[in-house]
Regions:
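NAD(P)-dependent Rossmann-like dehydrogenase/reductase catalytic/cofactor-binding core
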Residues: 1-206
Length: 206
């Protein structure tokens, strides 16, 4: 059971990314429409908590562990359980992802893991500042990069993470919790839907 996985991801790219890592770790990934009774159900959701993700993908919550694909898996891995996840499934997932010496954190059920929630909210706040015309996109990124020592500004960071992906994270967190803190800014929503850069300023009306 520790080496048999059933994957559920948001995209073909995510499926391939996770499959390559699991192959390197020595896990066997099952094919077919339904997981076998002994398989660990590994889900890589954006924005959802593990319970919602297990329900959406139609897998057994007792055998479900979620993994965050938003961040660099070569540096750290975050796993999330449902309230029903069996201890042996949690232990199997942790042992597998720690097999190559990379650090693994296991968290309880929560919308957006940790990194997804923090990064989406930081980018969304920067988008809201741009929408309010407090500063230009370039100035927002420069202020954060130079003032806080970030490697890149939040809008550039949002572009690298994917505006559409961040929109999905925020919308799902808002849907599950009802918390208005997760409401996507108009700046983010419009650019995500149009496939535009978050650093693209509004056109002049003159």
């Amino acid at each position: 059971p520790a080496n048999t996985m059933r994957l559920a991801t948001e995209s073909a790219d995510d499926q391939q990314k996770l499959a390559v890592l699991l192959d390197a770790l020595g896990a066997q990934v099952e094919e077919g429409d339904r997981p076998s009774e002994q398989a660990l159900c590994l889900i890589a959701p954006y924005g959802d908590d593990a319970t919602t993700a297990a329900n959406r993908f139609g897998v057994d919550a007792a055998r479900t562990v979620c993994v965050d694909l938003l961040t660099d898996l070569s540096r750290h891995r975050t796993l999330m359980m449902t309230p029903a996840t069996r201890p042996d499934m949690r232990a199997a997932a942790h042992a597998l992802f720690a097999r190559d010496g990379v650090g693994v954190t296991v968290i309880r059920d929560s919308v957006g893991f940790v990194a997804q929630r923090v990064l989406a909210m930081v980018v969304n706040l920067a988008c809201d500042i741009a929408q309010q015309r407090i500063a230009s996109p370039e100035d927002i990124d420069q202020a954060v990069r130079l003032g806080l020592g970030y490697p890149q500004g939040p809008l550039a960071w949002g572009d690298s993470l994917g505006p559409r992906r961040l929109l999905t994270i925020l919308e799902r967190m808002l849907n599950v919790t009802g918390d208005p803190r997760y409401r996507p800014s108009h700046w983010l929503r419009r650019r995500a839907l149009l496939g535009l850069s978050l650093r693209l300023d509004e056109p002049s009306t003159i």
